[in-house]
């Protein structure tokens, strides 16, 4: 089954870490990505730019309006995602639990990806 692992964290938290902690964090990410590539579970993933660079499009008075900034103000940001193909939701959650942002006050949301027909998996 395919899952989207949504990475949530606090903007700028890595700048609060020491250089050694930051290096270790990025090293863990590299290790997880390498492992998932080797096992064939990794479909893809990307980090997202800072929320200050976000544009939000909303319908206002029947017309689309482009606004600067994220959809809602929050202490956490949607920071990126991983798409994985693994045997179970438990395995997807195991992968998410290893993501280092979780230890620093972030969260990983595990969501099944719908199939091409638009039905729940």
Q: Language-model segments: which ranges?
A:
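Conserved, structured core segments of small domains
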Residues: 1-121
């Amino acid at each position: 089954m395919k899952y989207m692992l949504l990475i949530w964290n606090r903007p700028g938290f890595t700048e609060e870490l020491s250089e050694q902690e930051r290096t270790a964090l990025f090293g863990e990410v590299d290790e997880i990505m390498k492992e998932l590539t080797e096992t064939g579970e990794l479909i893809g993933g990307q980090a997202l730019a800072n929320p200050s660079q976000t544009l939000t499009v909303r319908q206002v008075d029947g017309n689309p309006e482009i606004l600067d900034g994220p959809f809602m103000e929050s202490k956490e940001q949607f920071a990126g995602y991983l798409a994985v193909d693994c045997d179970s939701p438990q395995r997807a959650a195991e992968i998410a639990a290893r993501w280092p942002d979780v230890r620093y006050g972030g969260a990983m949301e595990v969501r099944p990806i719908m199939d091409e027909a638009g039905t729940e998996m």
